């Protein structure tokens, strides 16, 4: 929870924040923008990594990247642009020691194991849950969620593996 809370604090301190990914991780970023809007009353737009160079970022901003491999070319390039612009950077990645994990200010390792096929279902689901947890934490910090509602969501997340097993 400490890493999740730390990332939520970065969102509270940022004047603007962007969620970024490409391909499957862009879909995770899209879903996540609704988590933040609905749970923390903050809208952070999802931007595709390959289009991020048109976004104006500065030192008060946070750029949150999502990458399964941690080596995604467009995402690395976009993070380089963000860092050059002075923005804070964070990422959720699946591969420890990857380029993206080394270049950001804060990294959360998702630990979902290797993807065996092109479809990144396991990694995408893990990243979605991490972003949901960050949005919940931010919602609690900002007073948008009561402690009871927060705990209920946490319990639901903890019971998810059992629900999957039943399917």
Identify the role of each PLM range.
Residues 1-13, 167:
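A short, well-structured juxtamembrane/interface segment
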Residues 12-159:
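Glycine-rich phosphate-binding loops that contact phosphosugars or nucleotide phosphates
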Residues 159-167:
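Accessory alpha-helical/coil subdomains and C-terminal extensions
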């Amino acid at each position: 929870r400490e890493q999740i809370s730390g990332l939520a604090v970065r969102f509270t301190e940022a004047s603007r924040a962007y969620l970024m990914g490409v391909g499957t991780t862009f879909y995770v970023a899209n879903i996540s923008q609704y988590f933040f809007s609905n749970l923390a009353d903050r809208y952070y737009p999802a931007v595709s990594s390959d289009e991020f160079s048109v976004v104006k970022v500065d030192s008060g901003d946070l750029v949150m990247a999502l990458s399964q491999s941690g080596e995604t070319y467009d995402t690395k390039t976009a993070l380089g642009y963000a860092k050059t612009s002075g923005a804070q950077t964070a990422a959720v990645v699946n591969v420890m020691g990857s380029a993206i994990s080394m270049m950001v200010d804060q990294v959360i390792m998702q630990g979902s194991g290797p993807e065996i096929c092109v479809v990144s279902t396991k990694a995408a689901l893990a990243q979605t849950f991490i972003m949901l947890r960050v949005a919940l934490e931010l919602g609690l910090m900002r007073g948008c969620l009561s402690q009871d509602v927060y705990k209920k969501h946490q319990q639901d997340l903890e019971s998810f593996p059992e629900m999957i097993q039943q399917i």
